[in-house]
Amino acid sequence: ATSVKFINNLQRQNGQPPFLQSLLNIDQTIHWADPLGQHGSTSAYAGPVPAVAHLHGAEVPSVSDGGPDAWWTPGFAQKGPGFVSDTYTYPNRQEPTLLWYHDHTLGATRTTVYAGLAAAYLLRDPNKEPGNLPGGPLDRATDRFGNTYERELIIQDRMFDTNGQWLFPSDG
């Protein structure tokens, strides 16, 4: 098993307002985490950034699942109704696979994953490692200390407008 302590450090260095803002605006007119209780506000959200990690596809106990209501803000100033702990335990007992983890905050997942809060999580079994694949050996690299590691690849789709800015359409 692996235990991971997640830290929401999405704040300015002094931890005081104005808070670090999400890369993309959060639509407060939809049901979302809403740490400041501004239900339905049409203004830009300017409060602390809520976050919660979810290991997508993992077989984990519910307290370590990172459900959408388990979010918390920096310093635990606000916590979602599903918050239990910032430390998750992953049993890692399922078959070897590539999983991915991402922010799972209620109503904000689409924007936080789009902004890059996502990464790979590998489960391996040395007894089941393929020595070679049809195209050759596994794509491995070596660091400056001679340690071999695998290269993970997560592909995400991005759209850009004519000015080269990220485009996240609000309709369709």
Locations of the language-model features?
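Histidine-centered copper-binding motifs that mark active-site loops
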Residues: 1-172
